[in-house]
């Protein structure tokens, strides 16, 4: 007859009698399903899960029990606030012998969405958006927060003004003394000298986080991304042809922005619609070896 396997987490006393705020695991690979109107996809996530350990005399928690609850979550038809709450409650219930009363989970994943070209018909590509979900159930109170990352292009307003000045000076010098300049002369000069100076622009990124309602039918990831991209006006593109690149250049020209402008645009687009919106933007400067950043 096989002897029972020892469990030192139950039999060995803790070396010092003190409660622990959180104990658990980080970086667990997990398949999850994200389903929203017009979108359904199984994605790879990494999960961090912990419970509190208020029982000072208990040596350790039961990691495998947390793992089982994550497996159950992966089998859900789709991620939702309700599914996350149920998973956290099950983690707490599985640790009654540890007197646990709180549990938390973080899911990090990349959401893939197909994006059409700006102009060219039947041309599209896939774009990845980093997404993070932070769910906490503490003393019976459930909280869920969503964070998304959005890439965009930013063109410096100051650099654009300096470039326009050089273009103006070049034009005046080229046609100095001519009482009448024909439109085709202007067009010809612009074709040759329109890039006499160009404003510096760079790839930029925004991190936006909001609270989600505990009874929300879905996570609303794509609507949040769409609102941020619309506020900025220059989301980075996927597949493009020359016509799309030209349209993107026009968008950048109409949406000159400092890092402060970007943060304020996003904040204004979220206020009154989402609870506790927070914004962090970063412009990876092409003029400088450092980044410009702002928080709202």
Curated annotation (Swiss-Prot):
What are the alphabetically sorted keywords of the record? Hydrolase
Q: Does the keyword Chaperone apply?
A: no
Q: What is this enzyme's catalytic activity, as reactions? A: GTP + H2O = 7,8-dihydroneopterin 3'-triphosphate + formate + H(+)
| Pathway entry | Cofactor biosynthesis; 7,8-dihydroneopterin triphosphate biosynthesis; 7,8-dihydroneopterin triphosphate from GTP: step 1/1
Q: Which InterPro entries is this protein grouped with?
A: GTP_cyclohydrolase_FolE2 (IPR022838), GTP_cyclohydrolase_FolE2/MptA (IPR003801)
- Where is the site May be catalytically important? 156
What biological-process terms (Gene Ontology) are attached?
tetrahydrofolate biosynthetic process
| Presence of the UniProt keyword Plastid in the record | no
Q: State the protein's name.
A: GTP cyclohydrolase FolE2
**Which source organism does the UniProt entry give?**
Delftia acidovorans (strain DSM 14801 / SPH-1)
Encoding gene, per UniProt annotation: folE2
């Amino acid at each position: 007859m096989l002897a029972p396997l020892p469990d030192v987490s139950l039999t060995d006393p803790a070396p010092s009698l003190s409660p622990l705020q959180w104990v658990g695991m980080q970086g667990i690979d997990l398949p999850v399903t994200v389903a929203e109107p017009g979108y359904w996809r199984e994605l790879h996530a990494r999960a961090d899960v912990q419970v509190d350990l208020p029982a000072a005399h208990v040596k350790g928690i039961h990691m495998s029990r947390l793992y089982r609850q994550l497996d159950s979550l992966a089998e859900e038809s789709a991620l939702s606030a309700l599914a996350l709450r149920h998973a956290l409650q099950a983690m707490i219930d599985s640790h009654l012998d540890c007197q646990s009363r709180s549990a938390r989970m973080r899911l990090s994943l990349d959401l893939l969405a197909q994006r059409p070209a700006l102009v060219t018909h039947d041309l599209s590509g896939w774009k990845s958006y980093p997404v993070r979900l932070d769910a906490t159930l503490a003393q019976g109170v459930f909280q869920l927060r969503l964070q998304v990352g959005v890439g965009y292009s930013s063109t410096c307003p100051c650099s654009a003004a300096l470039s326009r000045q050089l273009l103006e000076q070049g034009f005046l010098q080229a046609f100095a003394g001519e009482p009448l300049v024909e439109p085709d002369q202007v067009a010809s000069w612009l074709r040759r000298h329109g890039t006499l100076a160009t404003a510096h622009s760079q790839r930029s990124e925004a991190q936006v986080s909001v609270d989600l309602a505990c009874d929300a039918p879905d996570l609303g990831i794509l609507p949040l991304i769409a609102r941020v991209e619309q506020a900025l006006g220059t989301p980075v593109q996927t597949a493009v042809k020359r016509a799309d690149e030209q349209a993107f250049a026009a968008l950048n020209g109409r949406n000159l922005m400092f890092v402060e402008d970007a943060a304020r645009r996003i904040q204004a687009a979220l206020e009154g619609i989402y609870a506790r919106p927070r914004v962090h933007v970063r412009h990876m400067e092409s003029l400088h070896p450092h980044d410009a950043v702002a928080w709202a």
